[in-house]
Amino acid sequence: MGRYALDMEKYADLARTASAEGCVLLKNDNSTLPLKKGDKVAVFGRMAFHYYKSGLGSGGLVNTRYVVGILDALRACKDIALDEELIGIYEKWIKDHPYDEGEGWGLVPWSQEEMPVTEEMLQTASGDDVALVILGRTAGEDQDNTDKLGSYKLTRTEEDLIRKVSSQFSRTVVILNVGNIIDMKWVREFDPAAVLYAWQGGQEGGNGVCDVLTGRVNPCGKLTDTIAEDISDYPSTSNFGDLQKNYYKEDIYVGYRYFETFAKDKVLYPFGFGLSYTSFSVQASAEEKDEHTVCVKATVKNTGTKPGKEVLEVYAKAPQGVLDTPVRVLCGFAKTKELAAGEEEHITLEIPKNTFASYDDSGVTGHRDCFVLLEGTYTIYVGTDVRMAQKAGSYPQTFTVIEQLEEVCAPQKPFARMTRKPGDVIGYSDTPERIYGPYDRVEKPAEISQTGDKGYRLEDVYDKKISMETFVAQLSDEDLIMLFRGEGMCSPKVTPGTAAAFAGLTPSLRKFRIPAECASDGPSGIRMDCGTKAFSLPNGTLLGCTFNCELVRQLYEMTGLELRLNRVDTLLGPGLNIHRNPLNGRNFEYISEDPFLTGKMGAAQLQGLNIAGSTGTIKHFAANNQETKRHEADSIISVRALREIYLKGFEIAVKEGPARSVMTTYGPVNGVWTAGSYDLNTIVLRKDWGFSGIVMTDWWAKANHEGQPSDPRIHAVMAAAQNDVYMVTADAQDMQQDDMLEEFQKGNLTRGQLQRNAINILQFVLKSPAMLYEMNRISPEELKDRKNAAKDDPDVSKMMKFMADEQGNIRISGDGWDTHQGKEILADLDMKAGSYELQMKVKSNLDDLAQLPVTVYLDNIIKGTLSFRGSKGQWVTQQIRFDTFEGHHYMKLYFGATGLTVDHIAFQLSGGADKEQ
């Protein structure tokens, strides 16, 4: 197998291993797990039949060749026997209570209707050895969780299910197929013997869960979030979900930083917690190695009877002085190899002190806007979760300025933020007055004198025949503006069905041999809306729970090869936002409440992608901590909380990945939309962290001028802030779609700024696979491996193509369509922006009791289901409405039952679309 060949068996094995290592065992009374050889297993819960491989939105829309659910994997396991009679009862009920796909984007149910457990079911399973209760939850992009039954909380039917099954079976295991933590008070009330967080494990997820249940893999996952008694116990809850402003009053006291400092009694399961089928001992010492480093030495021993892995976690406690600090901060971790019973492993971690430095944003230490080490005693704790970590050593520290920075993104007005008072009492103090406005420090780089076309091509820069500046000098002002604009979604200029094309998109730019770059949605796999298959990865939270950077690195090396195979230059991921609150619907994409763990896991993903010569786009920069009104709701945060919590994970990934591409958010931070924030995109990223890649907006992002509302036409402020690529437009050549040319002509956007951004983009291009294709320098080995790759995907080149007429309408005949159950009709539609009515005219010879659903997808997003019934040979028409943007779209019609004849479908344009859909 060649270097660039994608070994799907290895890919699946790595994903399966990650899925298993990310499972977190919270409870296992009387060694209920692992299942014993010969056990007869009763499986309860309808979600056994509907596995959630990922959360909702762009991060989950991966077309897979297969998905292994938990029940699928259990059925394939020869060491146990399933109660098929009980399974049959569920299957019969599900026929009358089908899976509810919801109404489309942002309108999908958080959970599915659960089958009420009956005495008949309990009697059927009465002779079984063990019961598995499988529950599921989903949420995602544009769809936060809510503190309601069926979302964050269990429904009454689910509670009744656990209560009755736990009462009958001494060995009851509750398995949570969820993207995020949920309310867990029911564990104490109903007392099931075992509880397992299985998360959302991608297409190999069911196999991973089965491996843990059967003992093939000893559970070794650890919580990346604190599970508290009640949602109201999280200090962010009272300031989460507002439609206009969310004050981050908890400041740096996020997750365990809050609970371990102020509210230990509110914790059900602490950060870093997770059980094993064996036991371990940890002996550790810590001491100051030098003025920059702390050295931790530990011995982890398997003191039980089964082989297993353990996670060593290191926390620092800073002295409490003029600058308040949490009582614990994660500063290091390591996962052991699999240790046999009685075996031990010696681990040495050298931890830079700047890992646990504190940020002074007020000058209370005499050093405003600095990371500092405080005078006093620093204590190091080592253990297997934040609560069980024991003191391993301490050392005296003199006051030290670690890094002098500058104020960024400061709140417009002071607000009260949480502080730690003597005696670990909660206090509040105002954030400092800001010094700089958002535009006070915007630089206007000197322009490069334009030369016009001198015959140089980008390949000449690659070959070091000319400088990048000499090349960019050839580009006209219009070229520079067009280079700023990406196109999508589903641009025909790059891999079909992907999120965007950018760089060489226009004839004038292509003249200079600038290739079109391809970006695909992630992070849970490659999204290609034309139907091309890709590998669905475990979600971000699950990967974080592995605490295994090397495993994640190896997994994403395979994803990097898959990107190259599909000619995708960057995957839009990993997601590195903080789990500020459990109700954020997009937490499944992100990793943890802790920034250090988030950054290390993000860096591991990037390192894997980079090994394969691909890369990822870390997102969403920064503070995308709720989906409700994400385009408008202002995140009001202190500079200290930004620097220590919400930016830190990005910083680690930028420096250690390294990252080459960053995506900003939709919304504002402290009154300034991040897409146009010079503080974030230039000062923090490039000056403070040394980032040299590209920054792109989120899709159809907006910006503003401070004190003014946002506007989708305001793009010039983005370019001035060094946000290099606007995502996305229908046509990069359209000079009337935004304010770029107008602001350039006014002098508010300079040629030097556009040239600077162009250099950023083109430096990215030079390191991409697309550039190798442009120069015809892809190695013969890679070309051979691509040619030999198995393909069972739709042939996009042969897909039906239709273009809207002058009125924006499209009509497609249904002659010859195969509409048998499970069949699909695919088409490439070139549509205008606006509100469409889709009309579908069909007939059926069946009687009116026949149910004949047709589900309509556009770009892999469900737009609705037409619920036809038998019409006894009469033609009938149904309609659905939706909005869309201008450009190419991939339509799929899925026929849920056999029996329809289609006359035609028609798309009729009725009005302009809101681009913030």
Can you say where each PLM-predicted feature lies in the sequence?
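Glycoside hydrolase catalytic-domain context in secreted enzymes
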Residues: 1-388, 409-844, 853-917
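Short beta-strand elements
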Residues: 388-412
